[in-house]
Amino acid sequence: MKVNIAEKFSKISEYWKPYIAAELNGQQVKLDKLKGEFVFHHHEHEDELFLVVKGRFRMEFRDHNEWIEEGEFIVVPRGVEHKPVADEECWILLFEPASTLNTGNVVNDRTIKELERV
């Protein structure tokens, strides 16, 4: 299965609403546009990989922050509290288990239980 990432991102208009682009071996490749702040949360059983396709964002942890630039990725281990923050629009590709809830242990107005495909 071949996927044109730029074409997929052109169909995404909302921030903080991940879409499924592909699935493999119980994992999902998700695409999301970020802008502004998310919420501190953690995932009890899942690690998350965030790859910056366009732009950059800051991953805030309780004890430090990391800037992730275009072409870079960061892996957030399960159980680690984190909060993505994007001052400008940022396109990210997420690779994580299909069971991963976008807000982890927090349920709020940004929680999306059923993801759409793009």
What are these regions (language model features)?
Residues 26-28, 35-37, 54-58, 65, ...:
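Short, charged/polar surface micro-motifs in flexible loops or helix N-caps
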Residues 78-107:
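Ligand-binding loop in jelly-roll beta-barrel domains
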Residues 62-78:
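Short acidic-glycine-tyrosine-enriched beta hairpin
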Residues 1-30, 107-118:
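A short, N-terminal "cap"/entry segment at the start of jelly-roll beta-barrel domains
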Residues 33-34, 43-60:
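Short, conserved beta-strand element in jelly-roll/cupin
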Residues 41-43, 82:
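Histidine-centered active-site/metal-ligand motif
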Residues 20, 37-40:
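Short, charged beta-strand/loop "edge" motif centered at a coil->beta-strand transition
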Residues 25, 53-54, 69-70, 88:
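A cytosolic small-molecule/anion-sensing beta-strand core signal
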